[in-house]
């Protein structure tokens, strides 16, 4: 059997064994994809005992390519929410998440200095303690750039594997301790979150307003205060018994009924100007108007602004809502269309069909993936990751590497959405498949390389001490941030649990938090808010640690 065939066969065995281990559950908590690492350690141990060696170049390529696939697809997935999570609504959550990452770095650096822990070991323990695999890859890359011994990869892998189990358990323990210390009642916390969420964030609302203000009589819609700010869409106008689709130059009269869509505060402003709210139905039933939902799939309209399509003027159709990645937006004339946008159209059936032909609405395209943008993104990411950044006071250049470069490029490209006929939308099923393949390949190689000396290190070497270091890196930041967020951040417990799970990029912990109150979305919302920024920080932090500690700073 050739070296390549042998390597692929062994890694397949590792993947099968590891995924099987990952499916085991103890009280609802399991290793998940992390089981592949331990499958690799088991196979690597017996391969070492049998003096079976695999081709190093093949293993290295598979490891790096798997890491690239994983971080790129993560970036594509979280990119649309990354930049919005940095705005004011997520500043507090992201601030606490960044504090947790910084505290972990401080604890790791302190352990390195106090106990003279080898740099590869403390970086591996740091990555395992926070259950973050891309962090491990970034650390291995920067050590190679700094000229560390090739054996450091194995040391990092062993440190990661030793610290990983408590990294998963430690966050669950922290959630339990915070709940016990503050005597928290889950149902009350869920109700508190729902009340707060109702005041601070809401989906789009609708209202029917009768025009009673004589000063508005004869004005065009675009001339009405508050309607010209693009915060509210008028999707229907009823005059007498006639229901019509209004245009920006449509003139209103006293007694007209307007059906408006927008956020609650914006609708209230329009109500104060126009007249009074009425309960009369402006349903399209029994009329020649229809309401349809269509999906943007036509490459020719991607990136174009709604005003450029001139849908109102040409087709007498109103876009009343726009749903992008699950978030409802008020579609303004300045809104650019992206692949996968869901549009709410109001108009006559033939006109809606004409607009549908313009925007696409080909459902099959949502299940297809353009491969060209994938490799363009990966190529650009690798190039970006190879560019050295020289910072004052640092003894070595900082690089994003194969873990950070593709991630940053993916975040940017997914935010842009499309360039010409190229779009970076990736069907969720395809994204998940590539992401899982990538992380399985990476963990399989890391585990296999670590397996030869893992058992000896754990039993006869410094394994127990490494485990204690990992416990400190896991628990200290979690407990500090958990208490601060509760006491000073006035954060609800379920939101706090999502914050802690997201800060550790730990899906099992999120599943545990969701299980406390299955009907509340508080934990999932805070997890998704901090996840993009934390993933970026987790990739950058081991590189900064490695450079600073390498120079003895």
Swiss-Prot record:
GO terms for cellular component: plasma membrane. Disulfide bonds: none annotated. Its main location: membrane. It holds the Pfam family TrkA_C. GO terms for molecular function: monoatomic cation transmembrane transporter activity. It is a multi-pass membrane protein. Residues 191-276, 279-361 form the RCK C-terminal domain. Gene3D superfamilies: Regulator of K+ conductance, C-terminal domain. Keywords: Cell membrane, Membrane, Repeat, Transmembrane, Transmembrane helix, Transport. The keyword Amino-acid biosynthesis does not apply. It is found in: Cell membrane. The chain crosses the membrane at residues 4-24, 29-49, 65-85, 95-115, 158-178, 371-391, 403-425, 439-459, 465-485, 493-513, 533-553. Belongs to the AAE transporter (TC 2.A.81) family. YidE subfamily. This is Putative transport protein ASA_0825. The lineage of its organism: Bacteria, Pseudomonadati, Pseudomonadota, Gammaproteobacteria, Aeromonadales.
């Amino acid at each position: 059997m050739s070296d390549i065939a042998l390597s692929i066969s062994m890694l397949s065995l590792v993947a099968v064994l590891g995924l099987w281990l990952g499916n085991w559950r103890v009280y609802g908590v399991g290793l998940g994809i992390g089981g592949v690492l331990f499958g690799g350690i088991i196979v690597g141990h017996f391969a070492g005992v049998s003096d079976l060696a695999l081709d190093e170049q093949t293993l290295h390529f598979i490891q790096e390519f798997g890491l690239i696939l994983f971080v790129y697809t993560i970036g594509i997935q979280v990119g649309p929410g990354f930049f919005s999570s940095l705005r004011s609504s997520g500043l507090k959550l992201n601030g606490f998440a960044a504090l947790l990452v910084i505290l972990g770095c401080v604890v790791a650096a302190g352990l390195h200095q106090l106990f003279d822990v080898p740099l590869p070991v403390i970086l591996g323990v740091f990555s395992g303690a926070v259950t973050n695999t891309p962090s491990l890859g970034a650390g291995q890359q920067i050590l190679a750039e700094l000229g560390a011994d090739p054996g450091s990869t194995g040391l990092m892998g062993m440190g990661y594997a030793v610290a990983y189990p408590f990294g998963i358990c430690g966050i669950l323990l922290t959630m339990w301790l915070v709940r016990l210390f503050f005597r928290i009642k889950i149902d009350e916390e869920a109700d508190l979150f729902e009340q707060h969420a109702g005041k601070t964030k809401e989906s789009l609302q609708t209202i029917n307003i009768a025009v009673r203000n004589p000063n508005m009589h004869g004005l065009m819609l675009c001339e009405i205060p508050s309607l010209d700010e693009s915060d509210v869409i008028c999707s229907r106008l009823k005059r007498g018994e006639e229901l019509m689709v209004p245009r920006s130059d449509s003139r209103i009269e006293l007694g007209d009924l307007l059906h408006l869509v927008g956020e609650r505060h914006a609708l209230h402003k329009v109500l104060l100007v126009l007249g009074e709210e009425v309960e009369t139905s402006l349903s399209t039933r029994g009329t020649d108007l229809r309401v349809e939902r269509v999906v943007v799939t036509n490459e020719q309209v991607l990136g174009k602004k709604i005003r450029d399509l001139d849908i109102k003027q040409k087709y007498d159709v109103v876009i009343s809502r726009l749903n992008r990645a699950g978030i409802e937006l008020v579609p303004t004339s300045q809104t650019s269309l992206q692949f996968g946008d869901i549009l709410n159209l109001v108009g006559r059936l033939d006109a809606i069909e004409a607009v549908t032909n313009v925007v696409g609405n080909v459902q099959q395209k949502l299940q297809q993936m353009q491969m060209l943008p994938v490799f363009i993104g990966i190529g650009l990411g690798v190039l970006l990751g190879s560019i050295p950044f020289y910072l004052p006071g640092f003894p070595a250049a900082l690089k994003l590497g194969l873990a950070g470069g593709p991630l940053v490029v993916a975040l940017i490209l997914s935010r842009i959405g499309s360039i010409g006929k190229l779009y970076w939308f990736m069907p969720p099923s395809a994204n998940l498949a590539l992401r899982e393949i990538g992380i399985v390949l990476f963990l399989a190689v890391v585990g296999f390389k670590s397996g030869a000396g893992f058992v000896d290190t754990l039993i006869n070497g410094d394994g127990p001490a490494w485990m204690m270091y990992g416990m400190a890196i896991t628990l200290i930041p979690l407990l500090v941030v958990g208490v601060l967020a509760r006491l000073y951040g006035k954060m609800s417990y379920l939101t706090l649990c999502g914050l802690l799970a997201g800060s550790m990029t730990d899906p099992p912990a999120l599943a545990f938090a969701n299980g406390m109150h299955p009907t509340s979305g508080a934990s999932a919302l805070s997890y998704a808010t901090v996840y993009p920024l934390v993933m970026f920080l987790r990739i950058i932090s081991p590189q900064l640690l490695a450079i600073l500690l390498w120079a003895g700073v």
